[in-house]
Curated annotation (Swiss-Prot):
Modified residues (Phosphothreonine): 136-137, 293, 346
Similarity section: Belongs to the protein kinase superfamily. CMGC Ser/Thr protein kinase family. GSK-3 subfamily.
Modified sites of kind Phosphoserine: 26, 127, 219, 252, 342
EC nos: 2.7.11.1
Gene3D superfamilies for this protein: Phosphorylase Kinase, domain 1, Transferase(Phosphotransferase) domain 1
Catalysed conversion reaction: L-seryl-[protein] + ATP = O-phospho-L-seryl-[protein] + ADP + H(+); L-threonyl-[protein] + ATP = O-phospho-L-threonyl-[protein] + ADP + H(+)
Protein's recorded name: Shaggy-related protein kinase zeta
Positions of the catalytic residues: 197
Lineage: superkingdom: Eukaryota
Annotated positions of the Phosphotyrosine modification: 232
Location of region: Disordered: 1-33
The Protein kinase domain, residue ranges: 72-356
Length: 412
């Protein structure tokens, strides 16, 4: 499968980001970019064009490290949006391909996406290599995030199957969704980040190894209990019902709902809840889950308990999917797509679900016979997990290979 360029060859015109971007979520005030060590990066002047442009920047120079000049040739635009532009580039010194996300930077504020990406290091989260600032002839300041390049998105992989009237093989559904939940388990527990925009377009896939990675942390935030957040977040088809109800004190379980929608979409070949607007989105959800009870509405947003909704019975999950659907897939979807946020399983519990048991088999391989991408090299996400859950997550053959020496051992 080849990579397809998205969007026009030139960057869209960008308006400066207002301080309230991504919400009643306040951005941190930054008095001076140049004096902020955490944000320090070279500022390159006159960086208007994208495709064909060569960008040189300096990295290193901290803690006695030698300074090093790196040059990138911008090759093609791979994504555009209100945030800015993402382009593929090649490092002229090493030949390595990278993705560079270029966003307009308000000089008064820190960039939250950069701050969060610096915290993260996981096989199922796209990695930040370094960053630099650039200016244009109009004296606009841009932040450039240099990330590993992953050629495909889950959206395009699924489209590859649906355009030829095929279903994605169930093995790949398992492999991709397991890695999505593993990435979510990491960001939810280690840095404590909620992604807030999980969807197939924000899930990268390497077509050779089938490794899957979360990307685009432009909407992400560390959620603090008792602190209000904006509810108008997350792309519509994947938006949790509490967000549609206008909740502002939600939890990272909104990502679990979104991931449940992605799972259902891979199984069905199309979105499960294709609402045309927020109200229609809720109607689509009610058509499957039925009318929420007063208690479920209270769990989503206490201010809505007096609203009257048409009484619709839940559609049985086994009728939502085709007859030959594995019962474990249906069971997992039903545990993820619950009205009450606290009743949705956690990302780590989802990883341990029997739907993924095939991936834990000693002889599990890709259909072409190649080894699976890394699935069991867990990091801090296992801290606080019960021994029973860890035993279900890490297969016995993996424990034997490591002589039980993984960081969070499950006990005897």
């Amino acid at each position: 499968m080849t990579s397809i360029p998205l969007g026009p060859p030139q960057p869209p015109s960008l308006a400066p980001q207002p301080p309230h971007l991504h919400g009643g979520d306040s951005l941190k005030r930054r008095p001076d970019i140049d004096n902020d060590k955490e944000m320090s990066a070279a500022v390159i002047e006159g960086n208007d064009a994208v495709t064909g442009h060569i960008i040189s920047t300096t990295i290193g120079g901290k803690n006695g490290e030698p300074k090093q000049t790196i040059s990138y040739m911008a090759e093609r635009v791979v994504g555009t949006g209100s945030f800015g532009i993402v382009f593929q580039a090649k490092c002229l010194e090493t030949g390595e391909s990278v993705a560079i996300k270029k966003v307009l930077q308000d000089r008064r504020y820190k960039n939250r996406e950069l701050q969060l990406m610096r915290l993260m290091d996981h096989p199922n989260v796209v990695s930040l290599k370094h960053c630099f600032f650039s200016t244009t002839t109009r004296d606009e300041l841009f932040l450039n995030l240099v990330m590993e390049y992953v050629p495909e998105t889950l959206y395009r992989v699924l489209k590859h199957y649906t355009s030829s009237n095929q279903r994605m093989p169930i093995f790949y559904v398992k492999l991709y969704t397991y890695q999505i939940f593993r990435g979510l388990a990491y960001i939810h527990t280690a840095p404590g980040v909620c992604h807030r925009d999980v969807k197939p377009q924000n899930l990268l896939v390497d077509p050779l190894t089938h490794q899957c990675k979360l990307c685009d942390f432009g909407s992400a935030k560390v959620l603090v209990k008792g602190e209000a957040n904006i509810s108008y977040i997350c792309s519509r088809y994947y938006r949790a019902p509490e967000l549609i109800f206008g909740a502002t004190e939600y939890t990272s379980s909104i990502d679990i709902w979104s991931a449940g929608c992605v799972l259902a979409e891979l199984l069905l070949g199309q979105p499960l809840f294709p609402g045309e607007n927020s109200v229609d989105q809720l109607v689509e959800i009610i058509k499957v889950l039925g009318t929420p009870t007063r208690e479920e509405i209270r769990c989503m947003n206490p201010n809505y308990t007096d609203f009257r909704f048409p009484q619709i019975k839940a559609h049985p999950w086994h009728k939502v999917f085709h007859k030959r659907m594995p019962p474990e897939a249906i069971d997992l979807a039903s545990r993820l797509l619950q009205y009450s946020p606290s009743l949705r399983c956690t990302a780590l519990e989802a990883c341990a679900h029997p739907f993924f048991n095939e991936l834990r088999e000693p002889n599990a391989r890709l259909p072409n016979g190649r080894p699976l991408p890394p699935l069991f090299n867990f990091k801090q996400e296992l801290s606080g997990a019960s021994p029973e859950l860890i035993n279900r997550l890490i297969p016995e053959h993996v424990r034997r290979q490591m002589n039980g020496g993984f960081p969070f051992q499950a006990g005897p």
